[in-house]
Regions:
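Conserved MFS/SLC helix-loop-helix module at the cytosolic interface between two early adjacent transmembrane helices
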Residues: 79-118
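Paired small-residue
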Residues: 103, 107-110, 118-126, 327-333
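Helix-loop-helix hairpin linking two adjacent transmembrane segments in secondary transporters
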Residues: 119, 156-202
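Structural signature of the two symmetry-related core transmembrane helices
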Residues: 95-109, 300-315
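A late C-terminal transmembrane helix in Major Facilitator Superfamily
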Residues: 350-386, 396
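Cytoplasmic helix-loop-helix junction between adjacent transmembrane helices
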Residues: 123-164
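Juxtamembrane intracellular "pre-TM" segments in multi-pass secondary transporters
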Residues: 18-23, 207-238
Length: 433
């Protein structure tokens, strides 16, 4: 499928990937559009967090039942991400994005009319089924367009713009909740999806030529999934990405309890958490883009993990010495997200680089593993830890330690494979007289 609208690729009759591989820059707005697609999932999580108390009151649901609307979203999100990439590899990037974002918009509008908590669970599941397409396909598009340092720069630009989502979403949701009630955040999500659908229809180029499309045959998909998900180096780096993010996401999931109960802020005060996190993500992404091509990937990762380790240790120390309060209870979030944003573009490229034409499917597997862990954190870990800021700090440190272990194992695996001697050719068969 060719790009529509006034893009250079559409006018020339070639795909955008052919242009950028030839050296022509991608359109100026492509980073913003890909970031907006990737941010749709976080917006679906964070926008309605300030409405949790009213949702429970209006739908006669317990706090735990309201919390499970997050799990109802995250678990289908994780499962469906396995298919978004395969569909995008077979049908093209553009078509999959358009359908998925439109379905997300309809589900969001339906959430606004829910009358029982069970209805909201079901509709949130539909949101989860469709929301992951933007995140998966946007990563594949980056690798369709660029290689090496340019890919890292574009990934860093997307991460930097994507950083606004966790900060803006609860802020917007808090103001909507104050003026219009709990249904208004879902109306906002529907309008956002409608705007994105129109923007993608007019501006998003197709970056996967028809001759590079992959099969949807079950046997082919099963063998490819098995190959990707049984590769240790892929699992190590995906585990590192997922665990690093989970250390921060634990606070996002616990935001109503952490901010409103422990720190005593109002429903419009969620910027106390998401402001430092946004600033950290922006700073780390900017640094990652600046050092691309100048600092090696291992050194970039070392700097990112150094910042995250400093933040996690400082968080433990502050919680041991001081009672919960502002600003010290949220200050470590800035350094943690800064280190995370510095590391994640490099880790993502490590995950996708080996798979060539199967990048969409590999991106699906990576997103699935991250979303599955997010679902576990939402369903089990966050409710277990959010009753104490010390427990939350310990959770962040523990998840980071596991993520650092995954990155270390990946580095050792890659180093071992690079140093291994090439396989010796087998001798030719002996001819029999």
């Amino acid at each position: 499928m060719r790009a529509r609208g006034a893009s250079p690729a559409g006018q020339a009759g070639i795909t955008m990937s052919e242009l950028t591989r030839a050296g022509t820059p991608a359109p100026r707005g492509i980073a913003f559009l890909l970031a907006a697609l990737a941010a749709l999932g976080p917006f679906a999580i964070d926008t309605y967090l300030p409405s949790f108390p009213e949702i429970g009151a209006r739908l006669a649901a317990s706090p735990l039942a309201v919390q499970q609307t997050l799990s109802a979203y995250l678990l289908p999100f994780a499962l469906m991400t396995l298919w978004h990439g395969a569909l995008a590899d077979a049908l093209g990037r553009r078509r999959v994005v358009l359908v998925a974002v439109a379905v997300f918009g309809l589900a969001s509008l339906s959430c606004a009319f829910a009358t029982r908590i069970e209805h909201l669970w079901i509709l949130r599941a539909v949101q989860g089924i469709s929301a992951g397409a933007g995140m998966v396909v946007s990563r594949a598009i980056v690798r369709d367009l660029f290689d090496g340092p340019p890919a890292q720069r574009l990934m860093a630009q997307i991460t930097m713009m994507f950083a606004f989502a966790p900060a803006l979403a609860p802020l917007i949701g808090g103001w909507l909740q104050s003026f219009f009630g709990w249904r208004s955040p879902f109306v906002f999500l529907a309008l956002l999806a409608a705007s994105l659908t129109l923007a993608c229809y007019r501006l998003l180029p197709e970056t996967l030529p028809p001759d590079k499309r992959q099969s949807l045959r079950p046997s082919y998909l099963l063998s490819t999934y098995r190959r990707v998900l049984s590769t240790p180096r892929f699992l190590y780096v995906c585990g590192a990405i997922a665990l690093n993010f989970a250390g921060f996401f634990l606070y996002v999931l616990s935001a109503p309890m952490f901010l409103m109960t422990h720190l005593g802020v109002s429903e419009t005060g969620f910027l106390w958490l998401f402001g430092p996190s946004m600033s950290g993500l922006l700073t780390g992404s900017w640094i990652s883009g600046r050092v691309a091509g100048h600092l090696s990937r291992p050194r970039t990762l070392a700097a990112g993990y150094g910042l995250m380790g400093f933040a996690a240790c400082g968080n433990l120390l502050l919680n041991a010495l001081l009672p919960p309060g502002l600003p010290w209870s949220v200050a470590p979030i800035f350094f943690y997200t800064c280190g995370m944003a510095l590391a994640v573009p490099t880790l993502t490229l490590y995950a996708l680089d080996p798979y060539g034409a199967q990048r969409g499917l590999a991106a699906s597997c990576q997103t699935f593993l991250q979303a599955a862990l997010n679902g576990i954190v939402a369903a089990a870990l966050a409710p277990l830890l959010w009753h104490s800021t010390r427990h939350l700090a310990a959770g962040m440190a523990g998840l980071l330690a596991l993520g650092a272990l995954g990155a270390l194992l990946h580095h050792r695996r890659v180093s071992a494979e690079a140093g291994a001697p090439p396989p010796q050719p087998s001798p030719p068969p002996q001819e029999t007289p």
